[in-house]
Design a protein with these regions (language model features):
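Core of compact, soluble alpha-helical bundle domains
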Residues: 1-140
Length: 140
């Protein structure tokens, strides 16, 4: 049976998203990338509220396609690791332990999927357990 959130609601999701992206914008690795690609932050945040509402509460509020937005970014495994680190600190600070773990389980799955999608889009063949590193010669 799938684990269900204990204390996650729309208010908590908004708090997680706003806190997380506030930290991302200040991050030395991620901040410049986000600032270059997002001009108006509020629509992006609203989209992320809908995304995480769909992920955590099964609301079906999000109907976007995240892969096309990410394949154009100059990111690789180091960026996903940093993203996950900031996300983990955020949910551990704002959520009860079980919900933080569930958020992280979902976030890790999403990051892994996006990383594999980036590799595939860039014609990179990863071996089992290998991570995507931009400009490393694994082309198909």
């Amino acid at each position: 049976m799938a684990q269900e959130p204990i204390a996650v609601d729309e208010t908590l999701i908004e708090s997680v998203v706003r806190t997380f992206y506030g930290r991302v914008r200040k991050d030395h690795l991620l901040g410049p990338i986000f600032e270059e690609h997002i001009r108006d932050w509020e629509p992006h945040l609203q989209n992320m509220f809908a995304f995480w509402s769909s992920v955590m509460l099964h609301t079906n509020r999000y109907n976007g396609r995240p892969m096309p937005k990410h394949v154009v970014l100059p990111i690789d495994s180091a960026h996903f690791d940093q993203w996950l680190d900031i996300f983990k600190k955020t949910v551990e600070e704002l959520c009860v332990k079980e919900d933080a773990e569930l958020f992280m389980k979902k976030a890790t799955q999403i990051a892994h999927s996006l990383e594999l999608g980036l590799a595939f889009n860039n014609k990179v063949l990863l071996q089992p357990g290998e991570r995507y590193i931009r400009n490393k010669d694994h082309t198909l």
